[in-house]
């Protein structure tokens, strides 16, 4: 085989092997880029706390009335109280 063909073939195969998975820009993106700050506690069916190494605290709520998922601002007073109560319950001796 011609040396140029071998080099091109090796480069193409290397590029294919390195391109597996998501692009770096997508794999490090935080799930919650925008927060809802006017979500009533009574309207929340379920809360999910996302723990990602490269993002701040992120809380996703499933709403009762339309089953929609929204990211809730973790600075809301009722969220702070909920988290404090959950942590106290978990680490209570």
From Swiss-Prot:
Effect ascribed to mutating residue 29 to Q: Greatly impaired chemotactic activity and enhanced inhibition by heparin
Subcellular location: Secreted
Post-translational modification (record): Processed forms SDF-1-beta(3-72) and SDF-1-alpha(3-67) are produced after secretion by proteolytic cleavage of isoforms Beta and Alpha, respectively. The N-terminal processing is probably achieved by DPP4. Isoform Alpha is first cleaved at the C-terminus to yield a SDF-1-alpha(1-67) intermediate before being processed at the N-terminus. The C-terminal processing of isoform Alpha is reduced by binding to heparin and, probably, cell surface proteoglycans.
Region (Receptor binding): 39-41, 48-50, 60-70
UniProt-reported outcome of changing residue 46 to L: No significant effect on dimerization in neutral pH. Eliminates the pH dependence of dimerization
Effect of residue 68 to E: Greatly impaired CXCR4 activation
Outcome, altering residue 57 to C: Formation of an intermolecular disulfide bond, leading to a locked dimer. No effect on CXCR4 activation, but loss of chemotactic activity
Mutation effect (residue 48 to E): Impaired CXCR4 activation. Loss of integrin activation
Coiled coil regions in record: none
Keyword annotations: Chemotaxis, Cytokine, Disulfide bond, Growth factor, Host-virus interaction, Secreted, Signal
Entry GO CC: collagen-containing extracellular matrix; external side of plasma membrane; extracellular exosome; extracellular region
Disulfide bond sites: 30-55, 32-71
InterPro entries to which the protein is assigned, alphabetical: Chemokine_b/g/d, Chemokine_IL8-like_dom, CXC_Chemokine_domain, Interleukin_8-like_sf
Protein name: Stromal cell-derived factor 1
């Amino acid at each position: 085989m011609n040396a140029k063909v071998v080099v091109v073939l090796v480069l193409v195969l290397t590029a294919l092997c390195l391109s597996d998975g998501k692009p770096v820009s997508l794999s490090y993106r935080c799930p919650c880029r925008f927060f809802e700050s006017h979500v009533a506690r009574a309207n929340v069916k379920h809360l999910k706390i996302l723990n990602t190494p490269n993002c701040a605290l992120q809380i996703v709520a499933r709403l009762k009335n339309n089953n929609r998922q929204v990211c809730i601002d973790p600075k809301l007073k009722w969220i702070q109280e909920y988290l404090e109560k959950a942590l106290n319950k978990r680490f209570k001796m």
